[in-house]
């Protein structure tokens, strides 16, 4: 199909039509094309801070449904957070689980006031109340990067039932935080 489409575009351009340049088309975000399997797949997510109803994606199942987002936050796979605490969720793994990594992807679209997080905290707990911090990292958010995607991960070995992921916006820029999946391996 693609080869035929390129030929059709060339023919149309030769006749003076201004078509979309298919050679510059990058297609879907590769991560969005392949469903994920991971330890948190289908697990309950407890929202310690709510997602925004305008960008609910698939609701409470979004962050553990195995579906990664495409290039735009309105595609139904990215969940948006604008409350004071931004992203603050706990994944109930149902049983004590050996965990080797926890990852979430974030997007930045400066023109829409969507920014990468200024800080991320990843924690684990046996009881859902007392958490042990695995990672706390602060970031400098560069608003000169108009569009950017970034994974923020912890890697190691730990056991726990509850995995908490927190991402905060910076005081300077504020704005939205969008993520598509909490990946636990």
Question: Each predicted region: which residue ranges?
Answer:
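Catalytic domains of carbohydrate-active enzymes that cleave complex glycans
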Residues: 1-35
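Prokaryotic Sec-type signal peptides and long signal-anchor helices
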Residues: 5, 21-24, 135, 143, ...
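Compositionally biased non-globular segments, especially hydrophobic aliphatic-rich helices
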Residues: 6-11, 17, 52, 59-60, ...
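Intrinsically disordered, low-complexity repeat segments enriched in small/polar residues
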Residues: 10, 65-67, 160
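Predominantly extracellular/luminal regions of secreted and cell-surface proteins
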Residues: 30-68
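Residues that form or immediately flank small-molecule/cofactor binding pockets and catalytic motifs
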Residues: 50, 127, 139
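Aromatic, loop-rich ligand-recognition surfaces of beta-strand-rich domains
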Residues: 69-135, 146-185
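Short proline/glycine- and polar residue-rich coil/turn motifs
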Residues: 140-146
């Amino acid at each position: 199909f693609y080869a035929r489409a390129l030929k059709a575009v060339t023919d149309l351009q030769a006749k003076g039509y201004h078509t979309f340049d298919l050679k510059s088309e990058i297609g879907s975000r590769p991560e969005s094309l392949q469903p994920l399997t991971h330890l948190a797949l289908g697990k309950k997510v407890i929202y310690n801070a709510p997602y925004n109803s305008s960008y609910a994606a698939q609701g409470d199942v979004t962050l553990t449904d195995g579906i990664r987002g495409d290039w735009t936050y309105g595609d139904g796979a990215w969940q948006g957070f604008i409350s004071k605490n931004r992203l603050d969720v706990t994944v109930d793994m149902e049983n004590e689980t050996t965990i080797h990594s926890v990852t979430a992807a974030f997007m930045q679209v400066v023109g829409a006031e969507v920014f990468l997080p200024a800080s991320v905290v990843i924690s684990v707990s046996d009881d859902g109340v007392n958490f042990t911090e695995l990672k706390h990292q602060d970031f400098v958010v560069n608003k000169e990067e108009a569009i950017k995607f970034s994974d923020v991960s912890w890697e190691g070995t730990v056991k726990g039932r509850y995995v908490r992921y927190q991402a905060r916006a910076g005081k300077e820029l504020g704005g939205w935080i969008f993520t598509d999946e909490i990946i636990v391996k």
